């Protein structure tokens, strides 16, 4: 890892923004266009991770105190803000171009804050897991681009059921920790493997969705939505990242 990762991520943000202005946006009025659909989506995906990791490394550089940041009220407020920002990104129409970008950036900063404890706990593991996640995502994406039929369109219902199951299992895990005053490592490890598999399938499904939407873009009356595409893929990858990190920690 670069001795000054914040500089690297700042440059990556700048290059991503430059690429977006050059390839993804038209002006008068400002809006997305269908040209370079897939490339534009991945520019936003790269920008997503660059903003989140820049937030993490900036907090580390400034030595933010975990005990002061991750208090009960702050955690609740951050969780609620994160949900509201995500709903805003998904529901606000494309014509509110600047508003959606502000929500997008704020959401990524919050996601960066949630990653900060993992970075502080073990920087070497954090960097290794980041590379592992990138490799898995790249391999899965290539497989879907080569053969989109690897993943069925109908799997989304089962993925959603799986996601609800994981949420319930996490709540049960917290209850176990509360009752026993210590984590159940076997339960946690199995659950983290389930998370990795689930979000591997989500990555494949969302990659196929990107391919389909790129083909149908000019038929869509609402136009392309690179922010929504990128945030879906970002959330898939960050959940996979978390699963891999905690598997290595167990």
Name every feature range the model reports, one short phrase each.
Residues 1-250:
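A hydrophobic alpha-helical transmembrane-helix feature that marks the membrane cores
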